[in-house]
Each structure stands twice: as structure tokens, then as C-alpha cells.
């Protein structure tokens, strides 16, 4: 493994044109990549197809990840975490999950680490940290983030779930949908309106826990892709939530969400670039072996032109993503830069996997081939975490105002 490789795996890329060397990783990152890759190969890859069929990953996988130190990388060591603020370790996990083709099985962990845990680290008081962080690092407590509602998607400020305060308790009523880790989760960072008359300034974050009376989970939603990732509806009927489960300050929920979105969108971009590179690698392998009209499919001019186009665009995207990773590690990544990264890489990911399916011919439509699973898994990338249209609105507004 070395920083000069795309993912350090070799494959078809290593047989021909070398990718542009990556310079953002050091030896300790390469060692971490090798360890995480080995864990994926031994603990996830052999079972991924079964979990895809069952549409959920077992809790034992979370316990294994926690034991190996892959959960809570940024959590202080006193709570059982890795104690690092270096985002590059999280990026490596997203890359390896994407490149290995086990997005459904691994997506829940990146959500837990990179999207949910930052709320706990930035907003929890000491009592809350003691109560939740050790379990979240060990894999005993699985986290989720509940924003989207049946009638509210991109309009985050339009959530209708309410939390009415009575003494030391909030009474929560409402519903959420499309919640990743929705079945497995033990604690859910939930957006609620504590003052419906105040618009987005009346939004707060509450920690809803498994077993609270009135907190029910709906069905495990049957998605196009990412089948091993449990995604559920959540229902709240007069759920009494202790005021001690308020995350941060009342009325600051919208601000907290906006503050954490840059890392979420960067993480999606990191994974998108990895899947695009993997799709090209799989397609190079396939087209070099598959023959038609007496020669390898890779030798046809159309195949070479398509692969050249996809390779060049993916390399350009990777350079931009790597620079965004560096900026994020320096605390300088802007919301607009993260939005641009997510928009460009996820649209490219969908383009790459679609063109690569075409080069596989009929076999590209068979789920036993990783390219078919990647095609289904990839489609959500330009939707969740902010649609491409919203990303372009953010970037466009930064350019022209309004």
C-alpha cells in the first residue's frame, strides 16, 4: 500500500496507465488502510450477499468493528475512541467501503462515525458523553440521524415533528422516513420543532432512545440499492423525552445541522470517487477478458474511448476531492466547496457506473457482477445528503447572490 496508488489495490489500473499519485496520505494512513481492508475482506465481503438478501447487517458486525477500533475514530480516548481529529482516517474507510463494493454493509458505519458522532462530540454535555460515547465506540450503541419526514425532504426547516415541553420532559409527536440505521439504531439524533411559530429558529435536536414508550419503527424500506443498509420509518406518539436528552441549546437545531453538513457532503464525495475508480477497474478487467468478433472487447475503439473519458474525469474529480480533504483537515472547507464536490462526484459516479454497465453487456445487468450492484447502490448518491439541484443552488448562490 502506498500513497502513489489510487486505492493501493493494483488491479487493471496497475497493468497500464498509472493514476495520478495521491499525496495526502502518510505511512500511518497506509497502515490503517491495510488493517481496515483486511477487516472488510475477512468480516464483511464473505457475508455481504447474505446481508443484502436479509436487508440488514447484524449487530455482531458493529461489535467486531468496535473491537478493532473502527468506530469512534474522533472520540477522545477517555471514552474508548481513537482520539484523532485527522479526517483522513475516515476518508480511508469511505474509500475502501466504496472500492470493495460493500456499500450497503459499510454505509451504516460511516454514517455512525462521520455524520452522527460529530453531533455528540460538539454538543453533548459531560453527562451525555459518559452515557453514550463508550457504547458508540464499542458498537453496543448504534446511532442514526432523523431529519427527513414524509412531507419534508430538502426543506430542512419545514419539519413538522413537534416537541412540547412539560416541566423536565419534551413530549414528541411526528414521523420520520428514509432513516439510515433506522432498524438497528439505539439512539437517534432527531430534529423537532420546539417552537413551531419561529420557523427554522424554532428547531431543536433531541436524543430519542430505543425502548422509549411511543417510539416505534416502521418497516425496513425496500430500496433500489444498498440493500444491506437498514432504512426505516420512525413514528413518535406522545414520546416523553427527558430534557436531559436535549442536544445543545433549544432553538439552535437548524444551525447545528448546517454546521455539520460540509463533512457529510465531503464524505459522500469521497465514496463517490472510490466507486467510480472501482467501476473502471472492474470494467478494465472484464473487457480485457471478454472477447467479441475474435478480439477482447477492450480493444475496440469505442471501449478505449469510453474508458479514456471515464478515467480522465475520475482522476480530475479525485484531485479535487483530495484537496477538499486537505482543506477539511485544516478547518478551511467551505459549504460551497463541499456542495460542489458532492454535486460533481456523485453525478460522475452515476455516469461512470452506467457507462461501465454498458461495456459489460448483458452481464452488467446481473447482480452477481459488482458493477450491477454498484449501479443500483450509486443512484441515491445524488439524492441524499442534499440533491444535486440543491448543491447547484448553494454553489450558484455563492457566485451570483440571491
Feature locations, PLM:
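Alpha-helical interface subdomain recognition
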Residues: 8-101, 110, 123-128, 135-140, ...
Amino acid at each position: 500500500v502506498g500513497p502513489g496508488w489510487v486505492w493501493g489495490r493494483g488491479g487493471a489500473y496497475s497493468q497500464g496507465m498509472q493514476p495520478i499519485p495521491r499525496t495526502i496520505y502518510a505511512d500511518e494512513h497506509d497502515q490503517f488502510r491495510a488493517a481496515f481492508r483486511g477487516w472488510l475482506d475477512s468480516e464483511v465481503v464473505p457475508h455481504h450477499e447474505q446481508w443484502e438478501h436479509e436487508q440488514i447487517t447484524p449487530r455482531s458486525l458493529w461489535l467486531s468493528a468496535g473491537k478493532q477500533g473502527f468506530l469512534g475514530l474522533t472520540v477522545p480516548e477517555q471514552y474508548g475512541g481513537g482520539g484523532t481529529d485527522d479526517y483522513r482516517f475516515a476518508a480511508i474507510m469511505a474509500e475502501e467501503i466504496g472500492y470493495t463494493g460493500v456499500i450497503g454493509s459499510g454505509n451504516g458505519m460511516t454514517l455512525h462515525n462521520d455524520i452522527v458522532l460529530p453531533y455528540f462530540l460538539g454538543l453533548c454535555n459531560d453527562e451525555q458523553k459518559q452515557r453514550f460515547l463508550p457504547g458508540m465506540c464499542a458498537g453496543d450503541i448504534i446511532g442514526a440521524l432523523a431529519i427527513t419526514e414524509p412531507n419534508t425532504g430538502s426543506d430542512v426547516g419545514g419539519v413538522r415533528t413537534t416537541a412540547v415541553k412539560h416541566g423536565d420532559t419534551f413530549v414528541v409527536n411526528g414521523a420520520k422516513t428514509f432513516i439510515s440505521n433506522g432498524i438497528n439504531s439505539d439512539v437517534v439524533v432527531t430534529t423537532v420543532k420546539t417552537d413551531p411559530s419561529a420557523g427554522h429558529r424554532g428547531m431543536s435536536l433531541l436524543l430519542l432512545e430505543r425502548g422509549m414508550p411511543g417510539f416505534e419503527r416502521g418497516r425496513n424500506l425496500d430500496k433500489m440499492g444498498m440493500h444491506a443498509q437498514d432504512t426505516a420509518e420512525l413514528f413518535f406518539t406522545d414520546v416523553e423525552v427527558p430534557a436531559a436528552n436535549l442536544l445543545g441549546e433549544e432553538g439552535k437545531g437548524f444551525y447545528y445541522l448546517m454546521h455539520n453538513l460540509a463533512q457529510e457532503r465531503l464524505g459522500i464525495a469521497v465514496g463517490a470517487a472510490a466507486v467510480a475508480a472501482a467501476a473502471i477497474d472492474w470494467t478494465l478487467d472484464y473487457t480485457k477478458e471478454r472477447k467479441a468478433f475474435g478480439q477482447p472487447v477492450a480493444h475496440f475503439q469505442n471501449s478505449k474511448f469510453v474508458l479514456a473519458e471515464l478515467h480522465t474525469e475520475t482522476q480530475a474529480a479525485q484531485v479535487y476531492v483530495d484537496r477538499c480533504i486537505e482543506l477539511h483537515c485544516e478547518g478551511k472547507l467551505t459549504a460551497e466547496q463541499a456542495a460542489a464536490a458532492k454535486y460533481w462526484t456523485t453525478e460522475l459516479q452515476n455516469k461512470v457506473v452506467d457507462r461501465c454497465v454498458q461495456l459489460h453487456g448483458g452481464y452488467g445487468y446481473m447482480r452477481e457482477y459488482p458493477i450491477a450492484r454498484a449501479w443500483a447502490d450509486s443512484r441515491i448518491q445524488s439524492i441524499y445528503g442534499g440533491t444535486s439541484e440543491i448543491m447547484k443552488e448553494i454553489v450558484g448562490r455563492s457566485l451570483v447572490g440571491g
